[in-house]
């Protein structure tokens, strides 16, 4: 039998803050676009959009918290 040995990738956190910031910006753009789409939506679709946007806002809060954690890790030299 062939046994393959897989090596895990090293933990590269060097650009996590930037990636999270991009994700926040993209999520904010999605909120703006979905709110614009509400003008052409049915009541049911509007309700779904509102719920999605609430979920997006919660995700943004979590990402901002993660940014704080990552910035603290940078200051501490990424020690775990």
From Swiss-Prot:
UniProt subcellular location: Spore core
Superkingdom of this protein's organism: Bacteria
Main location, first listed in the record: other
Pfam families, per database record: Tlp
One BP term from GO: asexual sporulation
Induction remark: Expressed only in the forespore compartment of sporulating cells.
Keyword terms: Sporulation
InterPro entries per record: SASP_thioredoxin-like
HAMAP family: Tlp
NCBIfam families: SASP_tlp (TIGR03090)
Family: Belongs to the Tlp family.
Name this protein carries in UniProt: Small, acid-soluble spore protein Tlp
Lineage: Bacteria, Bacillati, Bacillota, Bacilli, Bacillales
